[in-house]
Amino acid sequence: MPPPRTGRGLLWLGLVLSSVCVALGSETQANSTTDALNVLLIIVDDLRPSLGCYGDKLVRSPNIDQLASHSLLFQNAFAQQAVCAPSRVSFLTGRRPDTTRLYDFNSYWRVHAGNFSTIPQYFKENGYVTMSVGKVFHPGISSNHTDDSPYSWSFPPYHPSSEKYENTKTCRGPDGELHANLLCPVDVLDVPEGTLPDKQSTEQAIQLLEKMKTSASPFFLAVGYHKPHIPFRYPKEFQKLYPLENITLAPDPEVPDGLPPVAYNPWMDIRQREDVQALNISVPYGPIPVDFQRKIRQSYFASVSYLDTQVGRLLSALDDLQLANSTIIAFTSDHGWALGEHGEWAKYSNFDVATHVPLIFYVPGRTASLPEAGEKLFPYLDPFDSASQLMEPGRQSMDLVELVSLFPTLAGLAGLQVPPRCPVPSFHVELCREGKNLLKHFRFRDLEEDPYLPGNPRELIAYSQYPRPSDIPQWNSDKPSLKDIKIMGYSIRTIDYRYTVWVGFNPDEFLANFSDIHAGELYFVDSDPLQDHNMYNDSQGGDLFQLLMP
């Protein structure tokens, strides 16, 4: 039984539902189409592809795997910057960080760079009721303290009331006292309000789906989940899925000899947690004691399984409301998270573990046949059920794709006009896209054909970047403010290699100097899939790299 709602939650829901009624009237006038597809966009925080559907044999994610079994799954999707606010603003506007000019958390793109349209704004302008639940935009300055309202949303976004406790002392330690720890399995009945943010977000999203079921207008619902973002604050029973004796270390837990210091992420954010501080770990390289490394990995995987239950409840409700046959579902993450690879933890780098993300699209009638009357595509699956079978993805693409392609792809799948490609420069253009339209991947001749889509992946490139304040790791290397950025690491990922150059950067002019090379990295994927052996030769310079930039 769900915990009783707070007065604040009931007030918000009442305001929202009354706003929906008002929005329905105005949006129906804008779009009288009754058969337009709805959109459910699920955005997860810090989720690398540690999922059964991506081949992870340890992680229990039956509900996300079930979604993938009816979907098109992209095996090689990459974020454009491995930190929350810049990545979210990038893919929600369809522009790269060098266009949004957001590399930190401290500016609002509409004021700082250009009045760029967003995905929900575009759907709203095309007759959709647009709704935000949980962490969609990063809260704060980077979304104008409003989650980009009123531009993007038909009414004010919802944030769970228990969100405010995420970084407070709610983790009960072995001493019986409460701490602000990294590892924070909890008894849900023992935490403030008797609930957790992602549980509240699921409940509110389901209530909105119930309201929209009878709507004459299509809806665009974005649901942002917090876990597995730190702190790892999740119901403690999920630890049982991952006994410590079954948890291995990262396959490459040492800092590679050839790694340039500028490329290293010193994981300062997790060092601030009380349980990590107690370990007295040296800065910047550590390492973290082996037994604690296992505990971090255990809690990350447990957080993923907890997240999976919330996704499962949301999709099961979509099914129960008979909306699965009229709703596109897109599932992704803002970036990945290192779990000890290269001696690193968290995001904040250009490595695959930080930039590689899940990207899954369910399109009714395209990626899967329409469900028969009474058929459930997404029945809730319990991750504690050991009898559950691993489900293979319905369709897969090995092509390299970027999160910046989410905007044109969702627009095209919904039958809206795909925004045009951006000119260079595009700061004056409100509606355009810098990502590719991925619609070609959804043109299936026969759902029974080879589930691996053909193509020439060597023609494709994914771009990422990360700023640094210094050539050597320091206290603000992970999250430098714009004024402190001295170096930008531009990274190209192809099917064959990852190539990164770290070049001088002028934060006042937002200008990279490719003749001022500080360091470089080159990893060949076939022979070095973990990216541990840097083959970069300083004589290669930045000329070739600059030619390959978008």
UniProtKB/Swiss-Prot annotation:
Expression (tissue specificity): Liver, kidney, lung, and placenta.
Cofactor remark: Binds 1 Ca(2+) ion per subunit.
Post-translational modification: Synthesized as a 75-kDa precursor form in the endoplasmic reticulum (ER), and then processed by proteolytic cleavage through various intermediates to yield a 55-kDa mature form, with the release of an 18 kDa polypeptide. The conversion to 3-oxoalanine (also known as C-formylglycine, FGly), of a serine or cysteine residue in prokaryotes and of a cysteine residue in eukaryotes, is critical for catalytic activity.
Effect on the protein upon substituting residue 88 to H: In MPS2; intermediate/severe form; higher affinity for the artificial substrate; poor transport to lysosomes
Signal sequence, start to end: 1-25
Record note on what altering residue 521 to V does: In MPS2; severe form
Mutation effect (residue 85 to S): In MPS2; severe form
Effect on the protein of changing residue 468 to L: In MPS2; mild to severe forms
Subcellular location: Lysosome
Mutagenesis or variant effect for residue 347 to T: In MPS2; severe form; deleterious mutation confirmed
Reported effect, residue 478 to Y: In MPS2; severe form
Documented effect of changing residue 182 to P: In MPS2; intermediate form
Chain positions with 3-oxoalanine (Cys) modification: 84
Result for mutant: residue 120 to H: In MPS2; mild form
Effect of mutating residue 88 to L: In MPS2; severe form
Binding locations of Ca(2+): 45-46, 84, 334-335
Disulfide bonds: 171-184, 422-432
Pfam short name (any one): Sulfatase
One GO biological process term: glycosaminoglycan catabolic process
GO molecular function, one term: calcium ion binding
Consequence recorded when altering residue 88 to P: In MPS2; severe form; total absence of residual activity; poor transport to lysosomes
Mutagenesis / variant outcome for changing residue 342 to Y: In MPS2; mild form
Effect seen on changing residue 335 to R: In MPS2; intermediate form
Protein name: Iduronate 2-sulfatase
Organism: Homo sapiens (Human)
Upper taxonomic lineage: Eukaryota, Metazoa, Chordata, Craniata, Vertebrata
